[in-house]
């Protein structure tokens, strides 16, 4: 049965989160009564309020009001006063993925999974479907620059969603097409073991109906291994791997643009197709890989080669995905969400390939549990940065773990052989180091899923203030 409109008020706890805000926005646009609360008055909260959605800042039992249903972010604990109040009133408690599944139930759906690259790949698929006049609904884990939001209504039959594997609820999503970009050691605090992560992604693919298909990146050993174990579903492989069904090759980069070709070979018919001289307005092989997943789906859905080329060339990117936010004396400043060693390594590799000068990385570790599980990987992921600045850990509600903090990470990176890694405490430290050591042509790259983005956005103005003060002193 389709979810009726007259179900009453839906209350979202943690509505300011990137995933929750998109779902709440779409339900509001569909005509449902929506409200919510969040601990922080952030940009997502303001966007929802501007659309007429009531959002309380802070979590309190009385925020529920006349709510009939309560939707919970994965970050909400059982000690949350709104959770407790909902339990006392015997209100249905709904997980974020369940609400997303309701939206997907009556459209043909593409779900993008993987431990990294989901947000960009989701955005690229949406862009190519848009270029092919599919007019898709989109719910993403990041702000799509072309839309100015992470949610898009769309009137077409297709829907594109980011499938968050962090708590296992992505297995609830009824997808016709499933994408797996990669599988790495992540969210072990939930899964308990990497074997459990592998099993979850296998189930994600096997949940695809017999008339659907999976799109798997076989450049990643774990995903190639997964592909070999899927024998009852249609699988399309992609990557730089010569054995991939959809293969990208002949890469060249010019600043923030990447040029490449794609060779496509159908397992069903044996037909071979080439797409040459593709232009992606982003740097980095990892972004070309993400684009190739989108091309694979667009091609399979019958979107013309010309529309694919046009959609790719016009792709506007995603907020906080190697986003240039300013410059100072020829030094380019970027902000990126990367917080896992694999993501950090890919971003810094892209920066190294496109920068004319050096790369200065400012990283804010996200969660003590992630540092604990991936400590050695973090020590080895900064090789493409000439200078590494490590900020205090963004705890995200976790308690510190002895021996796994920012200072210990700096020491571990040094022991792994990096020649210039430093501990910093605040934005003023960044201003001092960048103003002293950077030169025209250098890239400054902020990395992290916490509030490091605020430092990134503030740095250009802080450097301008430094210039003014320097000029004043000289006068």
Curated annotation (Swiss-Prot):
The organism of origin for this protein: Bartonella henselae (strain ATCC 49882 / DSM 28221 / CCUG 30454 / Houston 1) (Rochalimaea henselae)
Molecular function terms in GO for this entry?
Answer: ATP binding; UDP-N-acetylmuramate-L-alanine ligase activity
The gene name reads: murC
Its keywords, alphabetically, are: ATP-binding, Cell cycle, Cell division, Cell shape, Cell wall biogenesis/degradation, Cytoplasm, Ligase, Nucleotide-binding, Peptidoglycan synthesis
Catalytic activity, as annotated? UDP-N-acetyl-alpha-D-muramate + L-alanine + ATP = UDP-N-acetyl-alpha-D-muramoyl-L-alanine + ADP + phosphate + H(+)
Q: What is its main location?
A: cytoplasm
**What protein does this entry describe?**
UDP-N-acetylmuramate--L-alanine ligase
Per the record, GO CC terms?
cytoplasm
Pathways per UniProt: Cell wall biogenesis; peptidoglycan biosynthesis
């Amino acid at each position: 049965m389709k979810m009726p409109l007259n179900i009453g008020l839906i209350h979202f706890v943690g509505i300011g989160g990137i995933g929750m805000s998109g779902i709440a926005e779409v339900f509001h646009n569909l005509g449902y009564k929506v409200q919510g609360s969040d601990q922080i008055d952030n940009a997502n909260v303001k966007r929802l309020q501007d659309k007429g959605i009531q959002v309380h800042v802070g979590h309190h039992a009385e925020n529920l009001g006349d709510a009939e249903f309560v939707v919970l972010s994965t970050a909400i604990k059982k000690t949350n006063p709104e959770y407790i109040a909902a339990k006392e009133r015997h209100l249905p408690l709904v997980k974020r993925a369940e609400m997303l599944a309701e939206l997907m139930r009556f459209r043909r759906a593409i779900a993008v999974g993987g431990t990294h690259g989901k947000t960009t790949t989701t955005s690229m698929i949406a862009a190519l479907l848009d270029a092919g006049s599919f007019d898709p609904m989109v719910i993403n884990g990041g702000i799509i620059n072309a839309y100015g939001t992470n949610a898009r209504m769309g009137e077409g039959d297709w829907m594109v969603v980011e499938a968050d594997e962090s708590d296992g609820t992505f297995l609830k999503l009824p997808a016709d097409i499933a994408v797996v970009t990669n599988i790495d050691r992540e969210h072990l605090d939930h899964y308990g073991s990497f074997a459990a992560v592998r099993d979850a992604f296998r189930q994600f693919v096997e949940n695809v109906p017999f008339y659907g298909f999976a799109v798997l990146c076989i450049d990643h050993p774990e995903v190639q291994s997964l592909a070999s174990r899927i024998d009852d579903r249609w699988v399309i492989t992609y990557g730089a791997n010569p054995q991939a069904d959809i293969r990208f090759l002949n890469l060249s980069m010019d600043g923030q643009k990447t040029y490449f070709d794609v060779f496509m070979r159908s397992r069903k018919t044996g037909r071979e197709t080439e797409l040459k001289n593709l232009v992606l307005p982003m740097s980095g092989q990892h972004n070309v890989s993400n684009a190739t997943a989108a091309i694979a789906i667009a091609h399979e859905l019958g979107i013309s080669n010309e529309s694919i080329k046009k959609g790719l060339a016009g792709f506007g990117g995603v907020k906080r995905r190697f986003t240039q936010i300013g410059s100072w004396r020829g030094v380019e400043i970027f902000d990126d969400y990367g917080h896992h060693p694999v993501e950090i390594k890919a971003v810094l590799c892209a920066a190294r390939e496109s920068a004319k000068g050096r790369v200065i990385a400012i990283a804010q570790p996200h969660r003590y549990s992630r540092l604990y599980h991936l400590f050695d990987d973090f020590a080895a992921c900064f090789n493409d940065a000439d200078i590494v600045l490590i900020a205090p850990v963004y705890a995200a509600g976790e308690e510190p773990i002895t021996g796994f903090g920012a200072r210990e990470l700096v020491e571990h990176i040094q022991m792994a052989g990096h020649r210039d890694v430093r501990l910093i405490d605040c934005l003023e430290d960044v201003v001092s180091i960048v103003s002293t050591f950077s030169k025209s042509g250098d890239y400054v790259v902020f990395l992290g899923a916490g509030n490091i983005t605020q430092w990134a956005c503030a740095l250009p103005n802080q450097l301008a203030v430094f210039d003014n003060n320097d000029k004043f002193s000289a006068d």
